[in-house]
Amino acid sequence: MRQSKFFMPTLKEAPSDAVAKSHQLMLRGGYIRQVTAGVYAYLPLGYRVLRKAENIIEEEMNNINVPEMIMPHLLPATLWQESGRYKKYGAEMFKLQDRHGRESLLGPTHEETFTEIVAKNLKSYKQMPLALYQIQTKFRDENRPRFGLLRGREFVMLDGYSFAATREQLDEQFDDQKSAYLKIFNRAGVTVHPVIADSGTMGGKNSTEFQAPAAIGEDTIATNEKGTYAANLEMAKSIDTFKQDPEDAKELTKVATPGMDTIDKLAEFLKVPATRIVKSILYIADDQKVLVLIRGDKEINEVKLGHVLDADEVRTANADELVEITGSEKGGVGPIGADWADKIVADETVKGLYNVVVGANETDYQYQNANLDRDFKVDEFADIRTANEGELDPVDHLPLKFTTSIEVGHIFKLGTYYTKTMGADFLDNNGKAKPVIMGSYGIGVTRMLSAAVEQHLTENGIAWPKEIAPFDVHLIQMKMKDEAQTELAEKLEKELSTKYDVLYDDRNERPGVKFNDADLVGAPLRITIGRKAKDGIVEVKRPTDEKAMEVNISDLDAMITKELG
């Protein structure tokens, strides 16, 4: 490809609103251009990278015998209403009406459609296991699109779906997909950690995220140094090493605590450690009033709490509700005499505490020396706390390390979440009707490309992993009027193009302009044809090299083969 004919509008400086390095470099390098907030055009350079990533996906899916298909972008609302997700998905769904007033949506994902089109056509256990996938544009009405391709309103995604007659088949499919995904990320040069994750609005109870460590990441993952434990912070567990020595129960005492509406203030006022205080927070779970208790030095993890409560909507009570229900403003709520609570849920840290401080359900008052069972009851204990860095992991009891990361993939064991609701049954080997068992698998393809850039930054540009680089070799001719340089450059272009993707910079530009653009192209090998062309010598440089090396063209083929294969 001749660079003089290649549309690659580069920028000297990134726009001021581009915060992420990947966003800055993709704009500066002419990979993408914004059309509107969160929506981008993929210019030739960006589209080449995208297509190479898609080719890797296709090859790895073929290796596990998963065929590709395509579903429509425009979906009827009735399918999502049938599954119950039309309302649950919330404001992020793009909804529209046709001229007849029929409601539709732009697909953010396709579980319902695959259930309707595929699962409902699987009538016998003999037709399974089966898996399918597609690569297509998805739509999500992000409230704050940002970071370029990392959080957009339109994005390219691989989404795959598996169909099984037994749980054992689903487990095998899940493992096959996980293995294939790890190969995809490895080939794309993206370092990932498979981590325990929350399934969110997707449904199901078991899911794994693929998190790519990056400074700009919006997620936090918790890992140990051996790599035997990894979880999204939303789901991370840790061992609580605090132990309170047993004490005899003391007399329950009500004390005034004016203005002490935080744990720190209360602990200082009462001269007790935070571990001697039990926080009480009122949540509204659908139509239930749930009082949630946790030791004062810990924070509630609302994702974990949501799993325990298993409600469609879980939120903290607002100030008016708090006073109306409990009789107290913030800071004074507690479990003693909390007959208004439909349920009391406590974190495991509340067990084994003696003579603690709890709210008295009266503004500016607390109880001291409260004891579980004697003074208040708990309906359910569960791990609902947020893990802290440095706490011990539950596998090898090693300190947890937190890392910011980008979610680039997520796989789910959906089970019968959709097929039961939507009536997708098959006949088992005994002729009994059962719901099809499903899995769902996704890679954010455009997000993966941004993660690759974030992980392969150079001082002045990008060092693309070789399998997704837009070009394998970047030929740069220094002087276009130099006949020896032109002859050698055209010879190398012809020879190398039979095996590699070659970009030949034949522009009549200054060397500085060419080198700056080459840094943004980030090809694995840059070959410069300069003043020693007449001697058969070129300069070769990798993006991560500080200096170029001189190579005789007789040795060039062997060197390129060694580098690129």
Curated annotation (Swiss-Prot):
Catalyses which reaction(s): tRNA(Pro) + L-proline + ATP = L-prolyl-tRNA(Pro) + AMP + diphosphate
UniProt keyword annotations, A-Z: Aminoacyl-tRNA synthetase, ATP-binding, Cytoplasm, Ligase, Nucleotide-binding, Protein biosynthesis
EC number: 6.1.1.15
Gene3D superfamilies recorded: Anticodon-binding domain, Bira Bifunctional Protein, Domain 2, YbaK/aminoacyl-tRNA synthetase-associated domain
Cross-referenced SUPFAM superfamilies: Class II aaRS ABD-related (SSF52954), Class II aaRS and biotin synthetases (SSF55681), YbaK/ProRS associated domain (SSF55826)
Localization in the cell: Cytoplasm
Domain of life per record: Bacteria
InterPro entries from the UniProt entry: aa-tRNA-synt_IIb, aa-tRNA-synth_II, aa-tRNA-synth_II/BPL/LPL, Anticodon-bd, Anticodon-bd_dom_sf, Pro-tRNA-ligase_IIa, Pro-tRNA-synth_IIa_bac-type, Pro-tRNA-Synthase_IIa_type1
Single GO cellular component term: cytosol
GO function terms (MF aspect): aminoacyl-tRNA deacylase activity; ATP binding; catalytic activity, acting on a protein; proline-tRNA ligase activity; transferase activity
EC top class named in words: ligase
GO process terms (BP): prolyl-tRNA aminoacylation
Subunit structure: Homodimer.
Family classification: Belongs to the class-II aminoacyl-tRNA synthetase family. ProS type 1 subfamily.
Domain remark text: Consists of three domains: the N-terminal catalytic domain, the editing domain and the C-terminal anticodon-binding domain.
Function: Catalyzes the attachment of proline to tRNA(Pro) in a two-step reaction: proline is first activated by ATP to form Pro-AMP and then transferred to the acceptor end of tRNA(Pro). As ProRS can inadvertently accommodate and process non-cognate amino acids such as alanine and cysteine, to avoid such errors it has two additional distinct editing activities against alanine. One activity is designated as 'pretransfer' editing and involves the tRNA(Pro)-independent hydrolysis of activated Ala-AMP.
Protein name, entry field: Proline--tRNA ligase
